[in-house]
Structures are given as C-alpha cells and as structure tokens.
From Swiss-Prot:
SUPFAM superfamilies membership: Ribosomal protein S19 (SSF54570)
Taxonomic placement: Bacteria, Pseudomonadati, Pseudomonadota, Gammaproteobacteria, Candidatus Palibaumannia
PROSITE patterns referenced in this protein's UniProt entry, alphabetically: RIBOSOMAL_S19
Record protein name field: Small ribosomal subunit protein uS19
Signal peptide extent: none
GO cellular component labels: cytoplasm; small ribosomal subunit
Family: Belongs to the universal ribosomal protein uS19 family.
C-alpha cells in the first residue's frame, strides 16, 4: 500500500544529514546506514550507500532509476539456497 501523497516521502533525519554533508564535501566514501525504510532522494544519485541487511552492510550505488524506491529493496535479507535433493536415489 503506497504512502499518502499529502505526507510525502520519508527519510531518516540522520541519513539526510549524512547525504547532504557528503554532497557538500564531494565525499565518495560509502555512507553506512541501518535505515532500510528511507526513500531514495534525488540528492543521493551518484553516492554509494551501505545498507544493513541484518548481517552485513551491502554497498549500493544509487542510480537515477532508483529514486522513489526504498533503500531496503536493494539489500535482500533472506538467502535462498534451493530445495534439497532426495538423499536416496530413485530407481525406475
């Protein structure tokens, strides 16, 4: 369910401050964040943001197509290793 238009997009204040500082100083180091719920803003284009997936920080280079999406969409939290095969070989 999308967020109401009258509320506007959400971004954590501490993340916005880090992004503005990185843009002002032209810093290219990854910005580490645990805020998966924050929306990607146009100011973030060209920055690398390391988003926490519960175990480690996944570096994400923000492109213009990502604007409007959430940071958590690009750092998957679950690993699917496939279903296990049968231990006994089937005879036909």
């Amino acid at each position: 369910m999308p967020r109401s238009l009258k509320k506007g997009p959400f971004i954590d204040l501490h993340l916005l401050q880090k992004v503005e500082k990185a843009v002002k100083t032209n810093d290219k180091k990854p910005i580490r964040t645990w805020s998966r719920r924050s929306t990607i803003f146009p100011q973030m284009i060209g920055l690398t943001i390391a988003v926490h997936n519960g175990r480690q920080h996944i570096p994400i280079f923000v492109a213009d197509e990502m604007v409007g999406h959430k940071l958590g969409e690009f750092a998957p939290t679950r690993t699917y290793r496939g279903h296990t095969a049968d231990k006994k070989a089937k005879k036909y």
